[in-house]
Amino acid sequence: MSTIKVLNMAGAEVGTVELNDAIFGIEPNQAVVHEVVKNHLANCRQGNQSALTRGEVSGGGKKPWRQKGTGHARQGSTRAPQWTHGGIVFAPKPRSYSYVLNKKVKRLAMKSALSAKAAAGEIIVIDSIKMDSIKTKDFRAFLTAVKADGKSLVVTPAKDEVIVKSARNIPGVVTSMANLINVYDILNAKYLVLDKEALAVIEEVFA
């Protein structure tokens, strides 16, 4: 098991913690990670795009001109796709893009993402992430103290409204509960900032 420092919110070292190699020490499977990220983005799609086919556009019931003798190409409707204001060929309609992946695949991707962060030295463990009041300035100072400036995913063991509201106005900073973290958020962040209790939850869930 690898050992990393545990810091307090002022950035001072207060101890160490061992990371479970079964979660933080595997060889990352990039193909599986790619598939899970693709699935996450597909599931996030609204899928509400919509356009009208030639049969749904109003008007166009009358033949624009007679079939023969005008010198023009033959036309049957002013709402055919080649006309301005005509319908759309194979018009997109609202649909769901979501699909289901196997739990084992998602679990392997999560372990791969966590292992990649650990190998890169981008996991920061805090003994306790707590704030007395909602204060964005103080939360930014905390991230600076622990050297987690920039895009960061801050993980707490349970929902903490004070932490959520203190962090939400800081660009690039995302908060999450330990049981709700996902591969996309982990990879999208430069630093993974974990409450020590949140680390225990992650190891319990994915061990």
Outline where the language-model segments fall.
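Extended polybasic, low-complexity segments that bind anionic RNA or targeting/receptor surfaces
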Residues: M1-Q46, A91-A207
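Exposed boundary/loop context
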Residues: I4, N8, E18, H40, ...
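Glycine/serine-rich anion-binding loops at beta->alpha junctions
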Residues: R54-F90
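A short, flexible low-complexity segment enriched in Lys/Arg and Gly/Pro that occurs
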Residues: A31-K68
